[in-house]
Regions:
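Hydrophobic h-region of N-terminal signal peptides that target proteins for export
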Residues: 11-21
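Periplasmic alpha-helical coiled-coil/stalk elements that build and connect Gram-negative outer-membrane
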Residues: 122-241, 246, 340-343, 347, ...
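A short glycine-centered flexible hinge/capping loop motif at secondary-structure junctions
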Residues: 164-168, 372-376, 413
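Acidic, low-complexity, intrinsically disordered peripheral segments
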Residues: 395-424
Length: 424
C-alpha cells in the first residue's frame, strides 16, 4: 500500500515538470500557429477563390429580371394600366482578344505568389523561434556564470570585510572588491532583464509561456541548392508582368458575344374609351405576349488617341523592372549565402579558440585564487583572473549561440525548411 501511495506521489510531483518539458520542434510548431501565419493561409485561400471566381465568370451566365408596373392618371391608350413582365437572359463571351486567357494566367500567378509568400512567412516564423530558443539557452548559461561570479565576489568581499575590521586588509582593496561585487550584481540584473525581454517575445510569437529546454542544434550546412523564396517571388513577378502586357494588347481586338433574351408580358390595359369601342380595343391590345431575342454582338474600340499603346508601353516597362528586380534578388541571395558560409567557418574556429581560452582562464584563476587566499598575489591580479574566467565563459556561449543562429539564417536564405534541419 505504501509503495502505491509513493508512486502516486512521485507521479503528481513530476507531472508539472513533464508538462513543461518542451523542445525546439514543438516551439517551431507553436510559432507557426500564430495569427500572422493564419492570415497568410487565408490570403492564399483568397487568391485561389479569386482564380476560381474569374474562371466561372467567363462561363455562360443566366439571369432573371422581373417587375410590376402600374400607370395612373393620364396615359395613352396603348399604355397598360398594370403590367407584369419577366425577362430571362443568357450571356456568353465568345472572344475578347486573349484577355480572358491572360487574366486567368495572371490569377494563377497571383495564387502562386500568395503561396510562396505564405511559405516564406512560415519559414521566417521558424527562424524567429530558433533565434529565441538559442538566445534563451545562451543567456541562461551566461546568467549561471553571472551567479557564480557574484557568489565568488560576495564570499571574497565578506572575508575581506572581516580582515579589514581586524586591521589586516587595506581600505582600497576592500572598496575595489565591493565595487566589483556590486557591478556583478548589476550585470546579473541586466541579463535577467534581457531574459525577460526574450520571454516576452516568446509569448508574442507563440501565445504560450514556453519553457526552453533541451540541447537542440541544427545540422551543419553543406553546399545546398538555393530555393530562396524572395528569388522565386521575384521570378514569378516577371510572369505576372508579362500577362499584364497581354491584357493591354487584348484591347486592340474586337469582342464577340452571344446574348439570348426571352420576354414574357401580362398586361391589363383597361382603356379609357366609351363602351362601343371597348371590344375593338381589346382586339388590338394584347393582354399576354412573349418573345425571344437572339443577339450575336461585337464591340471594338477603333480609335482612342493611342491610349492603348501607352498602356502597352507602360506594362512592358513593368516587365523590365521585374526582370531587373529578379536579377538583383538572385545576386543578393548568392552573395549572402557565400558570406554566411564564410561566417560559419570563422565561427567554428572561434569556438575552438574560445574553448582553449576558457580552459586556460579556468586554470589561471584556480592558481591565482589559491595564491590570493594565501596572500601571495594582489587583489588586482585576482580580479583580473576572475574577470578573464567569466568573460571566457560568456564569449564561448555567445559564439555557440551565434553559430546556431547563423546556420538558421543560412537555411532560411537558401529557402530550406528550417524544421527539417533541427536535431534534438
Amino acid at each position: 500500500m505504501f509503495e502505491k501511495y509513493l508512486k502516486s506521489a512521485i507521479f503528481l510531483a513530476l507531472y508539472p515538470l513533464a508538462m513543461l518539458a518542451s523542445n525546439l520542434h514543438e516551439f517551431i510548431a507553436l510559432s507557426q500557429n500564430n495569427e500572422s501565419y493564419l492570415i497568410k493561409q487565408m490570403q492564399s485561400e483568397q487568391a485561389n477563390l479569386d482564380k476560381e471566381q474569374a474562371f466561372r465568370n467567363y462561363l455562360p451566365s443566366l439571369s432573371l429580371s422581373s417587375a410590376y408596373v402600374a400607370n395612373n392618371k393620364d396615359r395613352f391608350i396603348i399604355d397598360p394600366q398594370e403590367s407584369l413582365f419577366a425577362k430571362v437572359s443568357l450571356n456568353f463571351l465568345l472572344f475578347d482578344g486573349g484577355a480572358r486567357e491572360a487574366n486567368l494566367r495572371a490569377l494563377e500567378s497571383r495564387e502562386k505568389l500568395s503561396f510562396l509568400d505564405k511559405e516564406q512567412n512560415k519559414n521566417y516564423l521558424a527562424l524567429n523561434a530558433i533565434t529565441l530558443y538559442f538566445n534563451t539557452l545562451s543567456l541562461e548559461k551566461i546568467l549561471l556564470a553571472n551567479q557564480q561570479k557574484v557568489s565568488f565576489l560576495k564570499s571574497t568581499f565578506e572575508r575581506l570585510q572581516k580582515f579589514y575590521d581586524a586591521g589586516l586588509s587595506s581600505k582600497d582593496e576592500l572598496e575595489s572588491i565591493k565595487a566589483k561585487y556590486h557591478l556583478s550584481l548589476l550585470e546579473l540584473s541586466q541579463n535577467e532583464l534581457k531574459l525577460a525581454n526574450i520571454q516576452k517575445e516568446i509569448k508574442i510569437l507563440s501565445d504560450t509561456d514556453f519553457k526552453v529546454q533541451g540541447n537542440a542544434f541544427l545540422e551543419n550546412p553543406q553546399q545546398e541548392k538555393s530555393q530562396n523564396y524572395e528569388v522565386m517571388i521575384a521570378k514569378e513577378q516577371i510572369n505576372l508582368a508579362k500577362e499584364s502586357v497581354n491584357l493591354a494588347k487584348a484591347e486592340y481586338f474586337p469582342k464577340f458575344y452571344i446574348q439570348d433574351n426571352f420576354n414574357f408580358y401580362k398586361n391589363n390595359y383597361n382603356p379609357k374609351v366609351s363602351a362601343p369601342f371597348a371590344n375593338l380595343a381589346d382586339q388590338f391590345l394584347e393582354k399576354y405576349s412573349q418573345g425571344n431575342q437572339f443577339i450575336l454582338g461585337m464591340e471594338w474600340k477603333i480609335f482612342d488617341f493611342n491610349a492603348r499603346a501607352k498602356e502597352v508601353e507602360k506594362e512592358r516597362l513593368n516587365v523590365q523592372i521585374a526582370n531587373a528586380n529578379a536579377r538583383f534578388s538572385e545576386r543578393k541571395n548568392k552573395e549572402e549565402l557565400n558570406y554566411l558560409d564564410k561566417s560559419l567557418k570563422v565561427l567554428q574556429e572561434q569556438i575552438l579558440a574560445l574553448n582553449l581560452s576558457l580552459n586556460a582562464a579556468n586554470l589561471a584563476f584556480e592558481s591565482v585564487d589559491k595564491k590570493y587566499q594565501a596572500g601571495l598575489v594582489s587583489y588586482v591580479e585576482y580580479l583580473q583572473a576572475l574577470e578573464a574566467k567569466f568573460k571566457a565563459q560568456s564569449d564561448l556561449e555567445l559564439a555557440k549561440n551565434e553559430f546556431e543562429i547563423t546556420k538558421a539564417n543560412y537555411y532560411f536564405n537558401a529557402g530550406i525548411d528550417l524544421n527539417s534541419k533541427v536535431k534534438e
